[in-house]
Amino acid sequence: MPTFLLVNDDGYFSPGINALREALKSLGRVVVVAPDRNLSGVGHSLTFTEPLKMRKIDTDFYTVIDGTPADCVHLGYRVILEEKKPDLVLSGINEGPNLGEDITYSGTVSGAMEGRILGIPSIAFSAFGRENIMFEEIAKVCVDIVKKVLNEGIPEDTYLNVNIPNLRYEEIKGIKVTRQGKRAYKERVFKYIDPYGKPFYWIAAEEFGWHAEEGTDYWAVLNGYVSVTPLHLDLTNYKVMKSIKYLEDSP
């Protein structure tokens, strides 16, 4: 019976992680270790300067106080599972998409990345929608993908970023293996004044959007397909290595 380590960045109370937890129980043991709050946008931060505490919510269900998604992967693997590798690290289901360059901010994607760094095949799941998300329907798709990965595996140094349209299971057209797209929006910094006359700021996007080039993650979900983008840990831009060889020249 397979074992799954399930994390997220929306917090242990998120309907996304709870829907996926329930859906995965038919496949094997599901160990949930999730933050105690919403940490969307926290990226791949790991806590080195403060102690971490865990609180047990239920059987195989824990929350990490002040912990990031990457922290949750570490504590789940090293403490709860006692360094017995799970079959998969799964991160999500995120309440909203993780497409294009936004994956660099994503705690959801970073949870999967941390699993891969620890040598465990890993998948990040996100819902393409922001309101009235049908998590139970989306969880069915997640289970389908998990079954396929358990049978076929994921190449070393690779983890998967999966975005799923907010549709009923039978309405989804299929699965597309995609490349990372590019976003078509910018953040703004909004300034406000608190009751004491002090300024405070809020970083937010004016309007979400991505370039819908065929073959990209955004194109797939926009057209009713599940997007599966293979990501890897090696961030080297091999294409430009020769073009910057001039930097090796002596001054």
From Swiss-Prot:
Residue positions annotated to bind a divalent metal cation are 9-10, 40, 94
Name the InterPro entries on file.
SurE (IPR030048), SurE-like_Pase/nucleotidase (IPR002828), SurE-like_sf (IPR036523)
Tell me which EC number(s) this protein carries: 3.1.3.5
The cofactor remark states:
Binds 1 divalent metal cation per subunit.
List the catalysed reactions. a ribonucleoside 5'-phosphate + H2O = a ribonucleoside + phosphate
Cleaved signal peptide residues: none
Keyword line: Cytoplasm, Hydrolase, Metal-binding, Nucleotide-binding
Where does the protein end up? Cytoplasm
Any one Gene Ontology MF annotation carried by this entry is: nucleotide binding
User: Per the record, what is one GO cellular component?
Assistant: cytoplasm
Needed cofactors, names only, are: a divalent metal cation
Lineage, top-rank taxon, reads Bacteria
Matching HAMAP family: SurE
Q: Which family does it belong to?
A: Belongs to the SurE nucleotidase family.
Explain the purpose of this protein.
Nucleotidase that shows phosphatase activity on nucleoside 5'-monophosphates.
Note the NCBIfam families from the entry.
PRK00346.1-3 (NF001489), PRK00346.1-4 (NF001490), surE (TIGR00087)
Mind telling me what this protein is named? 5'-nucleotidase SurE
Organism of this sequence: Aquifex aeolicus (strain VF5)
- What gene is this protein a product of? surE
